[in-house]
């Protein structure tokens, strides 16, 4: 359970609409300075900080900091110097075709079968098979490694596409009807472990805005990004 449930929520500034993927350390530091002047208490670095994520067609699934693009330790230290908290964006349930994770484990993708020539793309991304324990464990290990090095105060947990191929390699044919249910259980299992291990981090749920507002999500995410128009 998030330790700060009884506290007033900080005023949040999110980097996304201001720069999208086009940023470096200097630009983010300038955003932090400007946002502090207008009363921001929590600065959130959105999409674009990880892997080879120069646009929305690559990098999802590779949750390591792109140090050639941004010095995240410097960014976080600057926030602390100004008395601000720091947050980061993740989309743990998705993967791009152009990613280290997909190249190493295409079978982690929902609907993947040997010999299949194509999967349904949405926003240039595929859905990971969270019905499979190995997939959940891989993403957990990546996120935990990040959180052990970068002590963030907030995570924006995003989810930006629908489920298309309703097939899991983790389930036998007679249980494929359970795919939706098992995907959700995998999501709960991952976010449950992380919120238990890092109770000081506020997890905010997002799904292209308020697209995932179920009671299970609210159990783990005491705050929801209600609309991408905000």
Map each language-model feature to its residues:
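Aromatic-lined carbohydrate-binding/catalytic grooves of carbohydrate-active enzymes
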Residues: 4-138, 144, 154
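Active-site neighborhood of glycoside hydrolase catalytic domains
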Residues: 66-73, 78-81, 103-230
